[in-house]
Curated annotation (Swiss-Prot):
GO terms for biological process: carbohydrate metabolic process. This is 5-oxoprolinase subunit A. Transmembrane segments: none annotated. Its EC number is 3.5.2.9. It holds the Pfam family LamB_YcsF. GO terms for molecular function: 5-oxoprolinase (ATP-hydrolyzing) activity; ATP binding. It comes from the Bacteria. InterPro entries: Glyco_hydro/deAcase_b/a-brl (IPR011330), LamB/YcsF/PxpA-like (IPR005501). It catalyses: 5-oxo-L-proline + ATP + 2 H2O = L-glutamate + ADP + phosphate + H(+).
Length: 254
């Protein structure tokens, strides 16, 4: 049994370098919701040094709301924005002796792509046209995963240790009760159940089947680093191999 651990980095949380000792895939903010050129370069350099798979973390252009405000934009504008962000991170990765291996949208773009086919298609098209060898990280069971697979991209299905789930496999919106799981012991138990049992309990009590291929560990919060280590240690103690998905090649030269 195996699993990938990923984290969203370059967002100003201050623990990026240390988190890269614990995760196997890094989703690096591309400047539109957080971060910037220097943060991107730092994260890429550390990821290359530590052999962590490099991923782009594009978003809507929304630094005021950390990329979490949903937007109604033309598909062509979404396509261009994703392409722009991929190009920026790819240039930095190439200069640092690495390459982008995957793409995981951020925030509202991630959530809207999971449920809105037009947005999913725009994001997938940008990724495919930029580099069809790139893998896509998307919410397990979502329409975004389906769209990526239909376009011929490798799709890696993602689950969250600290987010509440609805019965249809979607995440509880952050504005609603049950959206966030705060208890670390509960998060740890949920993670092990998602990886070993391939299921998660919804906020309404049902078991929801999931194809857990990568687990997102959020890097913000005062205890994020210690908790990330707890999760990694628990997975390895359970005999689960922790490494990047086979489709990704960490630290490869462009």
């Amino acid at each position: 049994m195996e699993i990938d651990l990923n984290a969203d980095l370059g967002e100003g949380c201050g623990s990026d370098e240390a988190l890269l000792d614990l995760v196997t895939s890094a989703n690096i903010a591309c400047g539109w919701h957080a971060g910037g050129a220097q943060a991107m370069r730092d994260c890429v350099r550390w990821a290359v040094e530590k052999g962590v798979s490099i991923g782009a973390h594009p978003s809507f252009h929304d630094p005021e709301n950390f990329g979490r405000k949903e937007m109604d934009l033309p598909a062509s504008e979404i396509y261009a924005g994703v392409l722009y962000q991929l190009g920026a991170l790819s240039a930095i990765a190439q200069a640092e002796g690495g390459r982008i291996a995957h793409v995981k949208p951020h925030g509202a773009l991630y959530n809207q792509a999971a449920r809105e086919p037009e947005i999913a298609d725009a994001v997938v098209s940008a990724i495919h046209d930029f580099d069809p060898s790139l893998a896509v990280f998307g919410l397990a069971k979502s329409g975004f995963v389906d769209a990526a697979q239909q376009a011929g991209l490798v799709a890696v299905e993602e689950v969250f240790a600290d987010r509440g789930y609805r019965a249809d496999g979607s995440l509880v919106p952050r504005s609603q009760p049950g959206a966030l799981v705060d208890d670390e012991n509960e998060m740890l138990a949920r993670t092990l159940e998602m990886v070993r049992g391939q299921r998660v309990r919804a906020v309404t009590g049902e078991w929801v089947p999931l194809n857990a291929q990568t687990v997102c560990l959020h890097g913000d919060g005062p205890h994020a680093l210690a908790f990330a280590k707890r999760i990694r240690d628990a997975l390895e103690a359970a005999g689960i191999d922790v490494h990047a998905p086979g489709a990704l090649h960490a630290g490869e030269r462009a």
